[in-house]
Amino acid sequence: MSTTPQYAASPKTGIVAISTANANRDGTGTLGTVFTAAANGSRIDRIIVTATGTTTAGTIRLYIHNGTTAYLYDEVSVDAITPSGTVSAFRYDNTNVNITIPTGYSLRASTANAETFNVIAMGGDY
């Protein structure tokens, strides 16, 4: 145990575009890798999900992957939205994440419907 506080040494942003429908909740099927931990581990402070077009009601699933198995971490409900000049596309922004992930772990994502989303994780490497 360290006698001094440990802070992220360098900021890090991970981004993936997902679009392959995956109805599985068990971590199998197509998952996009959003953020991978550095050699000394990493932390994730914020997760943003943004649709790139029209969405139907569905779910974005976030997983913690330990290098072998993906474990469901969170689900984000997606609203049906048709973006236009006056209507914004679907967006989810969680600024209260605070996940610490060790070396070899990653954050992964999937979409229940075949619609394109950009999944962004912001944090830092130790």
Model-flagged regions — what are they?
Residues 86-104:
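Beta-sandwich interaction modules
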Residues 33, 77-79, 96-98:
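Beta-strand-rich interaction surfaces with strong enrichment in secreted/lumenal proteins
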Residues 55-76:
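Short, surface-exposed beta-strand/strand-loop-strand elements in extracellular ectodomains
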Residues 45-50, 107-109:
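Buried hydrophobic-core signal for structured, non-transmembrane domains
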Residues 51-59, 113-117:
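Extended, low-complexity, turn-rich repeat/linker tracts enriched in Gly/Pro/Ser/Thr and Asp/Glu
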